[in-house]
């Protein structure tokens, strides 16, 4: 029986095992999918070594906080993973680890399903980790007009700007400045656990007076404090979660097998 994992920390609240259990049952696939808690980089390395040696583990999803850290442990990447240095899916093939970024595809489906046109839009992105890099690349490729990054980590923020600023001359990318008036902006939250800690609420206070067009929270597990903000529309990450999983399924089984699944039914049952 084929085995698949999702690894990260914390991992107990992940809905991925329930999602894939339903998928495998629906498609009559004999496979198991389970969550594995990885507490540190040393454990991550051990897990990857186990994957290389195992005859049963076919692939795994990678979640916070290891989407970037895993990149040094695998053998090759897809193009999006190379650009973003963010990997959320691996496939084991002949003892080699292949890395993929399916979050990009998931976000692309999210904006399509919710009829969002990012061309010429102004956007504030919260966070500067692997997920933020993925979303920012998507904004750039969709010809967004402005991207302002709001993050506590100035080093990773500066690196994003350095890496991406030359990709599209139509897109301006910069550090958020609370002395500037932001009007007609979207807000995209790419932080891992929402804005619940005191340090993260300090970030929220910097945008409290902005009237947002659309708020997109790519999380699907956490209830954030965005209801206290002003916005016309809010979208959470269930669509992105499901479609990145569909992409993982297609990669692992080397086919468009996800086309057989009823997305709306899955969203109703799992999310």
Regions found by a protein language model. Name each.
Residues 65, 189-193, 219-220:
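Short glycine-/small-residue-rich Rossmann-like dinucleotide-binding loops
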Residues 8, 101, 111-112, 116, ...:
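Glycine-rich adenosine-cofactor-binding loop
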Residues 75, 195-215:
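Rossmann-fold NAD(P) dinucleotide-binding segment
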Residues 168-185, 206-207:
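Short acidic low-complexity segments
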Residues 2-114, 222, 229:
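Phosphate/diphosphate ligand-binding glycine-rich loop within oxidoreductases
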Residues 144-164:
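NAD(P)-binding Rossmann-fold cofactor-contacting core
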